[in-house]
Amino acid sequence: MNSLLIIAACLALIGTVWAKEGYIVNYHTGCKYECFKLGDNDYCLRECKLRHGKGSGGYCYAFGCWCTHLYEQAVVWPLPKKKCNGK
């Protein structure tokens, strides 16, 4: 019984530690969503939740919206074969 609890705890921890993170990206331009208020940011939190679900979090990091706790298939910046503004 103890072994089962330890295994379940490890699986939960792995899911938490290895959750995907990254900048949300505009699929049309290939650019990150910009923000100017660094740290906790309502705009970034709202955009992350809108695009990636209720479980995600977000804040402004290096003038881009950084999302946390994303599902593995979430698309984040940089997009393959697409540079920001076509550059």
UniProtKB/Swiss-Prot annotation:
Modified residues (Asparagine amide): N85
Main subcellular location: secreted
Signal peptide span: 1-19
A single GO cellular-component term on record: extracellular region
Organism domain of life: Eukaryota
Stored InterPro entries: LCN-type_CS_alpha_beta_dom, Scorpion_toxin-like, Scorpion_toxin-like_sf, Scorpion_toxinL
Protein's GO biological process: defense response
All residue ranges annotated as the LCN-type CS-alpha/beta domain in the record: 20-85
Tissues of expression: Expressed by the venom gland.
Intrachain S-S bonds: C31-C84, C35-C60, C44-C65, C48-C67
Gene Ontology MF term list: sodium channel inhibitor activity; toxin activity
SUPFAM superfamilies in the record: Scorpion toxin-like
Domain notes: Has the structural arrangement of an alpha-helix connected to antiparallel beta-sheets by disulfide bonds (CS-alpha/beta).
Sequence similarity: Belongs to the long (4 C-C) scorpion toxin superfamily. Sodium channel inhibitor family. Beta subfamily.
The name this protein goes by in its record: Beta-toxin CsE3
Organism: Centruroides sculpturatus
Taxonomic path: Eukaryota, Metazoa, Ecdysozoa, Arthropoda, Chelicerata
